[in-house]
From Swiss-Prot:
<dbReference type="Pfam" id="PF00453">
    <property type="entry name" value="Ribosomal_L20"/>
</dbReference>
<keyword id="KW-0687">Ribonucleoprotein</keyword>
<keyword id="KW-0689">Ribosomal protein</keyword>
<protein>
    <recommendedName>
        <fullName>Large ribosomal subunit protein bL20c</fullName>
    </recommendedName>
</protein>
<dbReference type="GO" id="GO:0005840">
    <property type="term" value="C:ribosome"/>
</dbReference>
<keyword id="KW-0694">RNA-binding</keyword>
<dbReference type="InterPro" id="IPR005813">
    <property type="entry name" value="Ribosomal_bL20"/>
</dbReference>
<dbReference type="GO" id="GO:0019843">
    <property type="term" value="F:rRNA binding"/>
</dbReference>
<keyword id="KW-0150">Chloroplast</keyword>
<comment type="function">
    <text>Binds directly to 23S ribosomal RNA and is necessary for the in vitro assembly process of the 50S ribosomal subunit. It is not involved in the protein synthesizing functions of that subunit.</text>
</comment>
<dbReference type="GO" id="GO:1990904">
    <property type="term" value="C:ribonucleoprotein complex"/>
</dbReference>
<dbReference type="GO" id="GO:0000027">
    <property type="term" value="P:ribosomal large subunit assembly"/>
</dbReference>
<comment type="similarity">
    <text>Belongs to the bacterial ribosomal protein bL20 family.</text>
</comment>
<dbReference type="InterPro" id="IPR049946">
    <property type="entry name" value="RIBOSOMAL_L20_CS"/>
</dbReference>
<dbReference type="GO" id="GO:0003735">
    <property type="term" value="F:structural constituent of ribosome"/>
</dbReference>
<keyword id="KW-0699">rRNA-binding</keyword>
<dbReference type="GO" id="GO:0009507">
    <property type="term" value="C:chloroplast"/>
</dbReference>
Length: 117
């Protein structure tokens, strides 16, 4: 059986991995084995954090809506607002409500007052 010289294929594979890890620090961008490990770790973190990002943004929107709603009336909260929105079948998601709360508070106050009636 003849010896297979796989220099070009292996070099191409390694350079592709090196390009991915070129911005990493220290041995993580120089040594092939650690580059491979760090690439796997980076991709796992990216996959995990895409789900976390959705969670974090939803928490941010809820916090913003709650802060603005509590300023308007004494005994009104986020949970009551969302409950009343569902009762009235108004299709406003949390992202849109948070944008309204930041950009135009009076509009959110009008929405909440109309729902209460």
């Amino acid at each position: 059986m003849t010896r297979i010289r796989r220099g070009y294929i292996a070099r191409r594979r390694r350079t592709k991995i090196r390009l991915f890890a070129s911005s990493f620090r220290g041995a993580h961008s120089r040594l092939t084995r650690t580059i491979i490990q760090q690439k796997i770790r980076a991709l796992v973190s990216a996959h995990r954090d895409r789900d976390r990002q959705k969670r974090n943004f939803r928490r941010l929107w809820v916090t913003r809506i709650n802060a603005v709603i509590r300023e308007s009336t004494v005994s009104y909260s986020y949970s009551r607002l969302i409950n009343n929105l569902y009762k009235r079948q108004l299709l406003l998601n949390r992202k849109i409500l948070a944008q309204i709360a930041i950009l135009n508070r009076n509009c959110l106050y009008m929405i909440s007052n109309d729902i209460l009636k």
